[in-house]
A protein has these predicted regions:
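The conserved cystathionine-beta-synthase
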Residues: 5-29, 34-36, 53, 73-101, ...
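Intracellular, membrane-proximal regulatory regions of polytopic membrane proteins
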Residues: 11, 33-35, 44-50, 57, ...
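C-terminal structural cap/anchor segments
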Residues: 16, 30-31, 40, 45, ...
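Short hydrophobic beta-strand motif reused across regulatory alpha/beta modules
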Residues: 41-49, 106-115
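Soluble N-terminal domains of membrane-associated systems
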Residues: 46-51, 63, 125, 166-168
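Short, low-complexity N-terminal regulatory "tails/caps" that precede and couple sensory modules
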Residues: 151, 161, 165-168
């Protein structure tokens, strides 16, 4: 799970403190999801920290700046891997929110996560430095860079096969 959770009544300064703890150079910033008790309300990015003077960070809450959870790219955890690849490639960040069957946030998925799943399924283990480098750049590990193109060609091939069967 690579997202953080903050209660909606927390001051923006808390968001700033979370960001200082993130090791962005290693894997990119975590998403910050906002809740009120057991209810998911949305998410917040760093824009309020850039737009507001530091003096306002203790007066405004993260809940004042939340965005709807539905605005994050997402995929259900039961989706086949090819759908996850399409969702990741369609997202601006190269990452999607994974939703449980109940529609609740369960984690995130990026290119490296997909690459690890494919390699594991194939029984291939790459050295840790190679995996770390791919994670740092949010890229597929070597040998899997063609996954998006392969997945993109799948619907075209299946549609063409359907047309050929219909014409015979």
């Amino acid at each position: 799970r690579r997202f953080r959770v903050i209660e909606s009544d927390q001051p923006l300064r808390k968001l700033s403190q979370l960001r200082l703890q993130d090791d962005e150079a290693k894997r990119g910033a975590d998403w910050v999801l906002i809740c009120r008790g057991p209810h998911w309300l949305g998410w917040v990015d760093d824009q309020p920290l850039r737009d507001l003077p530091v003096q306002q960070w203790d007066r405004q809450t993260v809940g004042d700046h939340l965005r709807p959870l539905e605005s994050l790219p997402s995929v259900v955890d039961s989706a086949p891997i090819w759908q996850a690849i399409k969702a990741v490639e369609a997202s601006q960040q190269g990452r999607v929110l994974v939703l449980s069957p109940a529609g609740l946030p369960a984690g995130t998925l990026d290119r490296m996560d997909i690459g690890e799943a494919v390699l594991k399924r194939l029984g291939v283990r790459l050295p840790a430095p190679i995996l770390d480098e791919a994670r740092r750049h949010n890229s597929y590990p070597m040998g899997l860079v063609m996954l998006p193109q392969i997945v993109a060609s799948m619907p075209a091939n299946s549609e063409q096969s359907d047309r050929e069967r219909a014409s015979t």
